[in-house]
């Protein structure tokens, strides 16, 4: 073979290597240039303003478990807890250990999720181009990269958000057996299914297309693939099996009990369509850019489902079409309806038999059938789900609709090209329509990100959390508190928490330089010991009781209000407690000293509260995932039927610090003249079992025995006057 360069013919070994390399790179770029554009758009959408990512309870739990596993040498055996109170498998924790090993900052976990979702876009392009052509691959990958709902799940830490690349790889493995008829596909398919199940239990629905693949390609099955898959699945599930054995399979029993209840969830079809169209009800926030552009983008909600329907119909037509010749009619004329029905059934059975006979001989049709089964059967099973539907259940179906749209566009363009110039308008119109859809989706995603980064949303619209928090706002507030303490040489930062922030703030506060005390501010407030001087107090956005207690019982100077996206800001104070008005020698031995012999009355939000003042008589330093708890119960006028309890939780305690405990009084009742107070103490520690040399890690916690505290007079209660 001889190569021609610049008009000369020379042997290959004399061709300049640099010229060959340049030509090769030029050809490679010419054949794949679109993927660079797709990845550029995908990376912009997934990493622009990525620090505004959601950081609520689940996000903090997942990254904390990964971080603690790395830095404390623990073996994760569960992940976070599901909404039905079962423990998820720990596979995702092992993945998040990679960014956690590099930094304790959860931002790198968010970047890690974004990278995984970019890989999913790349795999979508490679898969679709391999089996359905370059145009189909380009359209499918571009639509998937710019779809709003999949993008949303690619911008925050959560175990289902790592599923997309593994879903595409799973379908890839099935196609290796069904379409290419290669052996050895079953092993990676089973392994990938196990990995997906570790990310979310709904992945078990992908077992249906796996069974269909086995039926369509029986000659490719090897027994050793099953053996290899069994061994590796046993290895990756062994940590979770340790947990299940120790709990006597309580999680599986919970799932079994739920199987008897359920209904048909037709709204699941709407969920599926929204994943495709990326357009739904505009946000209620009047400053939302998405809301402003909604009239210009609303057509996406019609066009995208129609394109997807075109993909389904096209794939279904190709799958069902088979060469057909009518059987010769029997001699004589059919008499009666019975004979006509029999003839129709005979013809139908003949069609089905010929279709099934010819199907295995056409791998292309087998692949399309597999795509349809992947999209239709799990969707129908989800509609019959026993415990309700949520958005992330549909991630196992992505990017299937976009692949089918790419197939539809490719076949439509090829058909119009093959039928002469009179159909050129259809081809060019298709190009224009797809280009407009992609541009509109890019605009829709970009303005949605701008809305999130600008706070043009309500932080209350994120059930099941009381309110939503983002990583940037939380880190900024903690950094401001830390910086203030260092600038003023204050030796402690007190931080209020509630159900929405306690997990996230407890983890993030560990990166602060100044010692911290975090406490649940639902009914309690911790103030510094007046003898040690003032301290910094960071108050949450909805801690109205804390602000009311500060006004009445402390000297608080508001320094700053660190902004929060989508809701009211934090409040940053420098505080010192006021002097007690009625000194008391009562208290609970070696635990709490009563500072004021009177319980003071407080009105807040049309409700009445009684407030008692105490000081800690001992200290406890922060410990690994440990909290210290006092449960105080009051009996107004000694009446146990009107009892009220307040639970105070702290990450640390310092001797001499002041504790304010508030008790809400019955609505419409009168203020009591006296209250009797009883107190119990317990510690919450992580439930990390030990199996010989293995120190396991779970998300669960254990409470030590509740100890009833003894008062200084030997009784188990203290009675104080209320005013």
Regions found by a protein language model. Name each.
Residues 2, 17, 131, 135, ...:
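Membrane-interface transmembrane helices that cradle and orient dolichyl/undecaprenyl
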Residues 40, 107, 111-131, 169, ...:
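Transmembrane-helix motifs of polytopic, lipid-linked glycan transferases
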């Amino acid at each position: 073979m001889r190569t021609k360069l610049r008009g000369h013919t020379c042997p290959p070994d004399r061709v300049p290597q640099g010229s060959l390399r340049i030509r090769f790179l030029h050809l490679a770029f010419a054949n794949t240039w679109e993927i660079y554009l797709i990845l550029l758009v995908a990376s912009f959408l997934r990493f622009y303003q990525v620090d505004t990512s959601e950081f609520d309870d689940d996000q903090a739990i997942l990254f904390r478990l990964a971080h603690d596993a790395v830095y404390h040498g623990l073996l994760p055996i569960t992940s976070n807890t599901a909404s039905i109170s079962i423990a998820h498998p720990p596979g995702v924790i092992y993945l998040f250990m990679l960014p956690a090993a590099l930094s304790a900052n959860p931002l790198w976990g968010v970047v890690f999720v974004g990278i995984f979702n970019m890989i999913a876009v790349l795999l979508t392009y490679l898969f679709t181009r391999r089996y359905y052509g370059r145009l189909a691959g380009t359209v499918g990958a571009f639509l998937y990269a710019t779809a709003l709902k999949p993008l949303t799940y690619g911008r925050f830490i959560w175990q289902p958000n790592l599923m997309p690349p593994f879903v595409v790889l799973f379908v890839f493995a099935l196609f290796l057996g069904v379409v290419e008829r290669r052996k050895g596909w079953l092993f990676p398919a089973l392994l990938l299914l196990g990995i997906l199940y570790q990310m979310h239990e709904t992945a078990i629905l992908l077992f249906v297309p796996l069974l269909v693949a086995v039926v369509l390609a029986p000659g490719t099955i090897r027994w050793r693939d099953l053996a290899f898959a069994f061994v590796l699945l046993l290895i990756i599930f062994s940590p979770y099996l340790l947990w299940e054995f120790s709990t006597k399979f309580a999680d599986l029993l919970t799932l079994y009990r739920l199987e008897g209840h359920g209904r048909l969830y037709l709204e699941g079809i709407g969920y599926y369509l929204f994943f495709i169209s990326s357009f739904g009800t505009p946000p209620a926030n009047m400053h939302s850019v998405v809301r402003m552009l909604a009239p210009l983008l609303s057509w996406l909600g019609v066009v995208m489902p129609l394109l997807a329907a075109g993909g389904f119909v096209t794939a279904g037509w190709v799958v069902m079409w088979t060469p057909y010749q009518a059987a010769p009619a029997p001699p004589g004329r059919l008499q009666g309806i019975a004979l006509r029905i029999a003839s129709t059934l005979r013809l139908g059975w003949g069609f089905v038999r010929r279709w099934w006979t010819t199907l295995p001989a056409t791998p292309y049709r087998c692949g399309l059938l597999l795509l349809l089964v992947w999209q239709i059967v799990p969707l129908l099973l989800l509609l019959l789900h026993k415990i309700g539907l949520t958005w992330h259940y549909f991630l196992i179906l992505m990017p299937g609709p976009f692949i089918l749209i790419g197939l539809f566009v490719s076949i439509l363009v090829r058909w119009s090209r093959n039928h002469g110039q009179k159909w050129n308008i259809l081809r060019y119109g298709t190009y224009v329509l797809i280009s407009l859809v992609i541009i509109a989706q890019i605009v829709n995603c970009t303005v949605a990100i701008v809305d999130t980064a600008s706070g043009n949303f309500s932080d209350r619209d994120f059930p099941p959390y009381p309110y939503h928090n983002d990583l940037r706002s939380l880190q900024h507030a903690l950094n401001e508190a830390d910086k203030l303490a260092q600038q003023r040489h204050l030796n402690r930062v007190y931080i209020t928490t509630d159900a929405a922030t306690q997990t996230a703030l407890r983890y993030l506060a560990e990166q602060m330089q100044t010692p911290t005390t975090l406490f649940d501010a639902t009914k309690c407030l911790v103030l510094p010991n007046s003898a040690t001087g003032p301290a910094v107090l960071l108050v949450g956005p909805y801690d109205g009781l804390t602000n009311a207690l500060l006004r009445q019982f402390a000297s608080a100077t508001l320094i700053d209000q660190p902004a929060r996206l989508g809701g009211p800001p934090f409040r940053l104070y420098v505080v010192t407690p006021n002097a007690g008005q009625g000194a008391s020698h009562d208290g609970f031995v070696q635990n709490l000293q009563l500072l004021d012999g009177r319980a003071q009355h407080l009105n807040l939000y049309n409700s009445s509260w009684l407030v008692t003042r105490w000081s800690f008589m001992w200290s406890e330093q922060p410990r690994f995932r440990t909290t210290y708890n006092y449960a105080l119960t009051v009996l107004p006028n000694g009446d146990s039927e009107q009892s009220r309890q307040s639970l105070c939780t702290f990450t640390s305690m310092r001797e001499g610090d002041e504790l304010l405990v508030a008790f809400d009084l019955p609505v419409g009742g009168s203020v009591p003249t006296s209250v009797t107070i009883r107190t119990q103490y317990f510690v919450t520690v992580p439930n990390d079992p030990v199996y010989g040399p293995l120190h396991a890690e779970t998300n669960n916690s254990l409470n030590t025995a509740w100890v009833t505290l003894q008062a200084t007079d030997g009784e188990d209660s203290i009675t104080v006057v209320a005013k």
